[in-house]
Amino acid sequence: MRQYTSKSILFMTAIALSACSHLPQTTSQGATVVSAQTVTQALGVDLASLEQKATALKPFEYIHNQDHYIAYLSTQPELIKVQKNGQLAKFFYQAGKVSFVQDKTGVYQFNQSGDVIAAIDANGKKQHANPADSKALWHKASQLQKLFGYNKADASAGRVKTGSDAKVNYLCIAKIQQVAQTNRVFRSPENAVVTENQIKATVRLNGNQYYNMDCQLSGDKVSKLSLMKK
C-alpha cells in the first residue's frame, strides 16, 4: 500500500466507485418527535418550509458503517440530517450560522453567537435549555458544518487538466480526508476500478482502519461517499 497526502492526491492511482443506490434512507422509525405544526405554534418558525427549501438543493450523502448523513448545500450547508443509532437529528443553518437543531429531545433555536434563545421539549412545551448541553449541541452542529461543507478540492476541480480519472480520484480522496479528518489515506491498487465519475477500492485510514470505499461524483462535486469497515 502507498500513502497519499493532500499534496500528492493527483498522483494517486485510480480507485473506483460503485453506485450508492443502496444507501439507507431516513425512515419514519428515525423521525424526529416534535411535529412541524407544534414547532410553528411554539417558536413561530416554519421548519417544514425551511426543510423543503433546503432539500431542493444539491445533496451530499455520507455513509460511515451504520451512520447516515445527508447535507444539502448551496454555497455551504443549509441542512444536515444525521441518522445514528436509529435516531434522526436535523441541523439547520442560515447565513453560515447554526440556526435550529431538532432531535429526539426537542427543538432548539440559536442566535448568531451560538446561544439558545428558545427551546421546546419532545412534547412541544417550552423549556429552559441547559447552557452546557446547548453549547455542546452548537459545537456539534458547527463541526458537522465543517465536515460536510465544500472543501478546497471542490473549488479547484475544474482546473484539473490531467484527465477525468485524476479528477474523480482527487475529489474522492479529498472528501475522505475531510470527513475522516485525516491526511493519512492509504489504498490498495488491487481490484481498484475507475470510471469518469465513480471509484471503488479498499482504503486504509490512520494506519490501521480498513474500509470498503464507494464514491460517486455529480459534476465537479462528490455526491455520495460510503466507508464500510472491513
UniProtKB/Swiss-Prot annotation:
Keywords: Signal. Residues 1-18 form the signal peptide. The keyword Signal applies. This is Uncharacterized protein PM0674. It comes from Pasteurella multocida (strain Pm70). The lineage of its organism: Bacteria, Pseudomonadati, Pseudomonadota, Gammaproteobacteria, Pasteurellales.
